[in-house]
Amino acid sequence: MSSHAMSVVILAAGKGTRMYSDLPKVLHTLAGKPMVQHVIDAAKHVGAQHIHLVYGHGGDLLQSTLKDASLNWVLQAEQLGTGHAMQQAAPFFSDDEDVLMLYGDVPLISVDTLQQLCAAKPQGGIGLLTVKLDDPTGYGRITRENGNVSGIVEHKDASDEQRQINEINTGILVANGADLKRWLAKLDNNNAQGEYYITDIIAMAWNEGREIAAVHPQRLSEVEGVNNRLQLARLEHVYQAEQAEKLLLAGVMLRDPARFDLRGTLQHGRDVEIDANVIIEGDVVLGNRVKIGAGCVIKNSVIGDDCEISPYSVVEDALLDTACTIGPFARLRPGAELLEGAHVGNFVEMKKARLGKGSKAGHLTYLGDAEIGDNVNIGAGTITCNYDGANKHKTIIGDDVFVGSDTQLVAPVTVAKGATIAAGTTVTRNIAENELVLTRVPQVHKQGWRRPVKKK
């Protein structure tokens, strides 16, 4: 790669009319994050010292969504073409740096391809990313003289002969800052669209005797843009297939790769098994021998060795120690923590709660703002009543406690080690060690009772 300092310009001013959306086009998500964020991440990984983001439609929403202090925001008040967009950013270019031009709606461009492009840029020339298509209709054609790139002709301006060319311009290029500023100043809009084309600088460079090096991406999907939701869905499919392939080759068993979604990053150990229709969001860590059942959603969580998550469970911002079992149909909300061997069964919800070693909450339970010790049994239908209408309060349960079914723990309350709470109890006061607590209404029997009969 060139040893020059480098800036990146990302064009993101388009309205995205064909998306039929109030959201700026580049904020539509692919794999769980805005398209333009994929491009920003690639720019950072390729070594950009400065990133200039050219925006127009929905600028306030763009800035509030991306929240990236490292970006230089450049307004393009009128959308008069790619050359015009680059002219808005040109005052920020240094003469001695390389400037790489990218697009906010071309989300799958790879760092490897960008590195190859930058390395191929000739001294004083231009590095240009091109591809060959079976059907190049609608794209700017690459013209060559004696095999060397000499210019780009937009489809609407191309002759019948030029339209037979199948090598097309992707729009991605890199050039020296001083050269780029000089060429941009010479652009005019004397063309069928009445716009300022960045592509015109290729002919300018050729006429100055500069070399233009054409580089091809590793995959066509890297340079495919998004103009409508169908194209976005297709790129999502491509991206997910690539991620699934990488995971399979790294030893993760995806039972159905076509029904797996990665919307973030996944670190994993050995012998991990993931069933169909699982969604991974944010930053997730899976230990060795973790098994995840069908239909689960795992988000921003760490799951230890030998854990098993049964089907249709949701785990978000949670921490699981080794050998924990979850679900089916369990929900771990932010702040949930399970220690070694803990079990959370079906229709159990936890939030800001810790379940100790070997403790179990088998079914139909809510545990919120709770600290639960080791070897505790939480009976079906138990609820920690943590909210009084204004503030949240904590429930503390010691080791070896037995909580019977249909128990309500009205926080703040503490249950000491070894206590037993009988089924159907409402706990409103602290319980001492090894106490039995029950608050049942006396059971009444009425012999020969007859139910009321409806009047006809």
UniProtKB/Swiss-Prot annotation:
Keyword Repeat appears in the UniProt entry: yes
Subcellular location: Cytoplasm
Active site: 363
Gene Ontology molecular function terms on file: glucosamine-1-phosphate N-acetyltransferase activity; magnesium ion binding; UDP-N-acetylglucosamine diphosphorylase activity
Residues annotated to bind acetyl-CoA: 380, 386-387, 405, 423, 440
Binding-site residues for Mg(2+), renumbered to this chain: 105, 227
InterPro entries in the record: Bifunctional_GlmU, GlmU-like, GlmU_C_LbH, Hexapep, Hexapep_transf_CS, MobA-like_NTP_Trfase, Nucleotide-diphossugar_trans, Trimer_LpxA-like_sf
GO terms under biological process: cell morphogenesis; cell wall organization; lipid A biosynthetic process; peptidoglycan biosynthetic process; regulation of cell shape; UDP-N-acetylglucosamine biosynthetic process
Annotated metabolic or biological route of this protein: Nucleotide-sugar biosynthesis; UDP-N-acetyl-alpha-D-glucosamine biosynthesis; N-acetyl-alpha-D-glucosamine 1-phosphate from alpha-D-glucosamine 6-phosphate (route II): step 2/2; Nucleotide-sugar biosynthesis; UDP-N-acetyl-alpha-D-glucosamine biosynthesis; UDP-N-acetyl-alpha-D-glucosamine from N-acetyl-alpha-D-glucosamine 1-phosphate: step 1/1; Bacterial outer membrane biogenesis; LPS lipid A biosynthesis
Record region (Linker): 230-250
Coiled-coil residue windows: none
Pfam families listed in its UniProt record: Hexapep, NTP_transf_3
Location of the region described as N-acetyltransferase in the Swiss-Prot/TrEMBL record: 251-456
Family the UniProt entry places it in: In the N-terminal section; belongs to the N-acetylglucosamine-1-phosphate uridyltransferase family.
Record text on subunit structure and interactions: Homotrimer.
Protein's name according to its UniProt entry: Bifunctional protein GlmU
